[in-house]
Amino acid sequence: SSGTLTQTEDCPSNVFATLNPLDVDTGSSNTFSNGNLSLVTNGNGSRSTLAANSGKFYAEVKMSTNGVMNGVQDMSKRITANTGTVLLLPSGATLYVAGSTTSYGSAWSANDIMQIAMDLDSATKKVYFGKDGQWWNGSAFANATPHTGTTLSDDTFYGFRCDSGVATPTSDWNFGNGFFGTTAISSEGSNASGIGKFEYDVPAGYTALSTKG
């Protein structure tokens, strides 16, 4: 049997980021699938194959089981490092910034779609989090544009990062190919850059993390 193929937007002129099965911590128990876009982890997770030190980048991740921490990390650090790391644990409504924790909204549900936008162009580099089409503004997910972001360190390369907040959570990333695992996005959002297909509107000025972006 030939099976069912999943369409990809990758081509010789542009390749989107995936999770990197080689960029993991010793002893981690990770299972990658769907072109390294789906991950079941019982360790320190994984990071994106691509990173940048300038530009504005957007990605989505669907948490098939709640308990995944997602965000961004300084790629010059070890994956286990707290420095240069910003992760959101939706199930516990907790934001981890360089190892310190703070409450962040209310708990999410399994199959919610997390939106992550990192701005590496502004004078103060920042990362923003949204859920199911609404951006967090410090008190609620109720705005069409990201703001009140978490500050990142300057002059370094950042990539996207996922980790386990509980035992063996599952996450399906969409870096622009338009799928969560083997399920296509249900309604493509707007994307002025024209690079990548996402469930929700890509914020103005942002694009997919890819070799063209």
Describe each region flagged by the PLM.
Residues 1-213:
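PRY/SPRY (B30.2) beta-sandwich protein-interaction domains
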